[in-house]
Amino acid sequence: CQGMVIAETFYRENADGSREWFNPADVEVQRDDHGRVTGARLKTDGQPVRIGGIEKMSKSKNNGVDPQSMVAKYGADTVRLFSMFAAPPEQSLEWNEAGVEGMARFLKRFWREVTAHAGGPDHAVVDPAELDAGQKAMRRQLHETIQKVSDDIGRRHAFNTAIAALMELLNALGKFADASEQGRAVRHEALEAMVLLLNPVVPHISHALWQVLGHPVTVLEDQPWPRVDPAALVRDTATLAVQVNGKLRGTIELPVN
């Protein structure tokens, strides 16, 4: 099944030994804390159906998903984002609507982050000499992300790990509550970079958010790709592990110089 789209299958056995297969959209599934299917019932009659495992999408197993219905429900950007995130091209993609919903939540969070920032005071330009430790750490993660995403997409063609890095960056921005002049400058730099880095995967949302950030209507593909600032990657401190009798007891931060 390498490189194929696969999905869960559900069925009931008929009296003659044949199987009647039900589309996953028509089945209510129960899962454990690890996301594994523990039970399933047909939505129309509430009666149990058997779990047939994960198979290549096919008419015979009735486990296909209509892409148009998913696009109509979640939008083309969300479906594309899930498809690129769920598996690298050389591996099989397991279709999971819960995963699509997760991508929709990520994009909604990103939209809220950008619009909330755009609704605040005007931002300054980042002045590296004026940044405090927290601002430097946030900016370092931004430029580490630019470096990773550029390599993942440009050299490795690994969109899934690039998207994961952008999710981590958004989580960090959500915790970065610095509303000072330089804090807002760092946030603005990060949000602009995220819009450009996500543009190959979610072009419609990226185009809209680029305008929210104050830019005129333009073709984002004509914008320069974010560049890594080598100075932003430099760490002022190093984390050292403290071990006693071979067991980790804590960590300490020490100046690099």
Place the predicted regions along the sequence by residue.
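Long, charged, mostly alpha-helical binding arms that flank functional sites
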Residues: 1-185
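Basic, alpha-helical terminal appendages of large translation-related enzymes
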Residues: 57, 63, 93-96, 174-185, ...
